[in-house]
């Protein structure tokens, strides 16, 4: 409207000459000019209170997600700082380098102080040792010390040391290379090391078991002992004694031969009174008999005062 009024005034002035304006018209014209002048500085701007203004930034769920990500990054930064401080305190990195360990060009890692470790995994063909003229001390805090390579394991505890291996084991002197103990029975005969008085095993497979000429061979078990041979079992000695709390069972496919002086204590053998009826109940009676050559055999008792003279016996003519 202001532009139309200005155009009409210009046409009137051009056709009729200069036209004098009143004070009111001049004030209105001056106000319009000021508005147009000020609008040049606000070109391209939109009032911030405009309802149709496009809203930017993270709002709603996106804003909450952004806050969670920022908090998570802050927590990770704090954890990283704590780990860095712990590593710095343990390794003791200072102006002069690392005070707790040394790294050498040959690949040697040397610890300069007492180190607390959980599990150590040496590299292939690596060595763990101590300094010259100093002992290497390895201790466990109320736990066993375990050295393991593949299926071979050495466990050192307070009251025992156990070695487990599926491929055998061998002990030798590192200076003289002399084999002290080996389980390679095809090459070396099995001998207990000097100072070892007993060997505790659950199952052993060997060709023979012998003792020294001046000592006895004692085989002790807490439960049941089974001695089995593929081609027979031969027990030889100056004196052979069997002490057991239960039953002793001898089984053989062909025969059982006892050579030498055989002593059988009958105090523990079950016996029945002479007044019992033969064959009463579920019991079957046998009489223990011995041949002149030491062969033992049993005879079923079918009548009173029955002896060992039966037709079917392993003694032959003499019994």
UniProtKB/Swiss-Prot annotation:
The chain crosses the membrane at residues 67-87. Residues 1-10 have a biased composition (Low complexity). Residues 22-33 have a biased composition (Basic and acidic residues). Glycans are attached at residues 159, 212, 259. Disulfide bonds join 289-315, 291-308. Coiled coil: none annotated. Residues 1-33 are annotated as: Disordered. Disulfide bonds are present. It is a single-pass type II membrane protein. Residues 88-318 are extracellular. Keywords: Cell membrane, Cytoplasm, Cytoskeleton, Disulfide bond, Glycoprotein, Membrane, Signal-anchor, Transmembrane, Transmembrane helix. GO terms for biological process: cardiac muscle cell development; gene expression; glucose homeostasis; glucose import in response to insulin stimulus; muscle organ development; response to glucose; vascular associated smooth muscle cell development. InterPro entries: Sarcoglycan (IPR006875), Sgcb (IPR027659). Residues 1-66 are cytoplasmic. It is found in: Cell membrane, Sarcolemma; Cytoplasm, Cytoskeleton. GO terms for cellular component: cytoplasm; cytoskeleton; sarcoglycan complex; sarcolemma. PANTHER family: BETA-SARCOGLYCAN, SARCOGLYCANS. Cross-link to form 2 major subcomplexes: one consisting of SGCB, SGCD and SGCG and the other consisting of SGCB and SGCD. The association between SGCB and SGCG is particularly strong while SGCA is loosely associated with the other sarcoglycans. Component of the sarcoglycan complex, a subcomplex of the dystrophin-glycoprotein complex which forms a link between the F-actin cytoskeleton and the extracellular matrix. Belongs to the sarcoglycan beta/delta/gamma/zeta family. This is Beta-sarcoglycan. The gene is SGCB.
């Amino acid at each position: 409207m202001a532009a139309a009024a200005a155009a009409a005034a210009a046409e009137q002035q051009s056709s009729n000459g200069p036209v004098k304006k009143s004070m009111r018209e001049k004030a209105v014209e001056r106000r319009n000019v000021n508005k147009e002048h000020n609008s040049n500085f606000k070109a391209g701007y939109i009032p911030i209170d405009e309802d149709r203004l496009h809203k930017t930034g993270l709002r709603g769920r996106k804003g909450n997600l952004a806050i969670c990500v920022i908090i998570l990054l802050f927590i990770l930064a704090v954890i990283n700082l704590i780990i860095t401080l712990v590593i710095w305190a343990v390794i003791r990195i200072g102006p002069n380098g690392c005070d707790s360990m040394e790294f050498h060009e040959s690949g040697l890692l040397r610890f300069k102080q007492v180190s607390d470790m959980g599990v150590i995994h040496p590299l292939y063909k690596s060595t763990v040792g101590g300094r010259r003229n100093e002992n290497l001390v390895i201790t466990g805090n109320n736990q066993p010390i375990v050295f393991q390579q593949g299926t071979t394991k050495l466990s050192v505890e307070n009251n025992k040391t156990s070695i487990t291996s599926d491929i055998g084991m061998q002990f030798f002197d590192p200076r003289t290379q002399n084999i002290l103990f080996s389980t390679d029975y095809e090459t070396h005969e099995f001998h207990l090391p000097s100072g070892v008085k007993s060997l505790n095993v659950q199952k052993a497979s060997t060709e023979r078991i012998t003792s020294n000429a001046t000592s006895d061979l004692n085989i002790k078990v807490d439960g049941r002992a089974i001695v089995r041979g593929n081609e027979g079992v031969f027990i030889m000695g100056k004196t052979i004694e069997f002490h057991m709390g239960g039953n002793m069972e001898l089984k053989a496919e062909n025969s059982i031969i006892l050579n030498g002086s055989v002593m059988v204590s009958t105090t523990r053998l079950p016996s029945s009174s002479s007044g019992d009826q033969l064959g009463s109940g579920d019991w079957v009676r046998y009489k223990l008999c011995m041949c002149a050559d030491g062969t033992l055999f049993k005879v079923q008792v079918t009548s009173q005062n029955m002896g060992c003279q039966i037709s079917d016996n392993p003694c032959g003519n003499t019994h």
